[in-house]
Amino acid sequence: MAQDDSYEEKPEVISSDSGGSGYSTEIQIVGTVTSSDGSYVEYEIVHQKRSVWRRYSDFESLVKLMRRQYPAAIVPPIPGKQSLLSYAKHPRKAKSDAEFLNFRSRMLELFLRQCLLHPCIRSNPIFDKFIHSTVSWHVTLSSLDLPKDSNTDPLRLPPIATEHDPFAHLRSSMPLVMANSLSPPSSRALKPIHSLSNPSTASSLEPSSPLGSEDECHPPTSDMQPTHELNESPSTPTAPDFPHYNSSPSELSPTQRRSSISNGKDAPSPVLKDLTSYTQEVIVCRKFLHHSLSPSIHSTLSSISKMESCLSKLGSAFHSLTALNEIQLANHLQVIANAFEFSGMYAKEFEQEFNSSVYEKMVQSMQLAKCAADALKYKQLKIQQRDFLQDQLIHSNTMSATDSMVAASPTIHPATRLNTIQRAVVSQAKKGYTIFGRLQNVLHDFVEGETSISKESLQQHKNTIENQLAAANWDCQKIDEFMDAELKFYKECQTSQWEEIIKSVHECIYKWAQTNLQRWLRTREELENLSKDI
């Protein structure tokens, strides 16, 4: 491997503690090493006077692992992969481009600092091995007892996988829901446990999208413009006051929950209202950043790049005029040409600093906001999963009552008995359920040709729902216990990020204006001295 000396070591990061917890965020990426064949790059991480080397793919696996262990947490993002366009233009230099490696090093260092601020990740033993263990990351992962199934839906995972899960045996059968779209239970739900997960409903909270498709930016140059495909997931780089909410439904007794649902009120709970309101704020802010601020900054960078090119060409043009005039005038033209060339050089420096100090941090801020939106969405879906199970329990109780009524009237025909149960189920279906889900349930019952429902099946179904509802309530309670800390972490990260952005905007423009002013004041002085000699 060959050491890449083009990376300039940065000044020491200011140490800070999160709420006096003793976790220092003093961590750096001080260098990069490219493999001899150029196939990968390793980054040197220094923390607490210890140094380890990690590849970009190691960072990817760490993020995926943290998102699996903390589905309800705001896991900081890492920069995206090299764009296909830039790789197509420079296939052999993509891994060794100094400008791109510097950009990625800055963003990975920011990721590590945010992880050290995170209330859960900073004390995670796997993350500790990542920043301290000198053993290769592949070997470290092989030695850990991690679940092999990485495609499990997040709604079937505990909110915090690092703690004991008393409902682990129920996770695989937990129902999946979509945002604001649930299918009502039917008589087919009265089958064994595996049929509780309605195939017409699927969680819209899929595992995080591939990191290469996330918001990403690259240092813009004359032949490579920044590329960052910003999807429309809700996110925001602002730090508004976060509403405090508690899962009050989980604190009610089963009787109270059933009576509150059976009242027939369709108004959402205060918990869901708070989450919906905050998520809407996230969407509005992110749309402004995506459609207004980000394009404006990109346009500014492009204009600065064009200005640098024009100034350099203008300086060259003035240089060419020196051969066409007498010596005194040629000296004047030489001074002006030098001034224009220096202005072009200052514009190039201004473009690079503005990109690294402002644009890159803004994109990372949007990525972090997307992670926060995913955590809030997980919370919303957990509440909907719990409400869905509460509805199923009501339906099951209705069926039991109907079955008892029919048992007291033996003259009722079995087919009439089934229709009575079906009408009870349909009467509980509300407008929030999809037509497709109802139609699918009807077709399923028709094909199966069910004509009777045993009391044992009803009781087994009811017991299963009660156990799953207990698991959902436990999940919501766990999320509430650390959600305030998660939102506080998010607010601190975004506030710190935007304080740095505002400071960087001022410093970049002030430095550019000051150097240009000094250069042209010096040019005026030189021209005045030349004029005295004419």
UniProtKB/Swiss-Prot annotation:
It comes from the Eukaryota. It is found in: Cytoplasm; Endosome membrane; Preautophagosomal structure membrane. GO terms for molecular function: phosphatidylinositol-3-phosphate binding. This is Autophagy-related protein 20. Residues 245-263 have a biased composition (Polar residues). Residues 1-137 form the PX domain. GO terms for biological process: autophagy of mitochondrion; early endosome to Golgi transport; mitophagy; protein transport; reticulophagy. It comes from Schizosaccharomyces pombe (strain 972 / ATCC 24843) (Fission yeast). The PX domain binds phosphatidylinositol 3-phosphate which is necessary for peripheral membrane localization of ATG20 to the perivacuolar punctate structures.
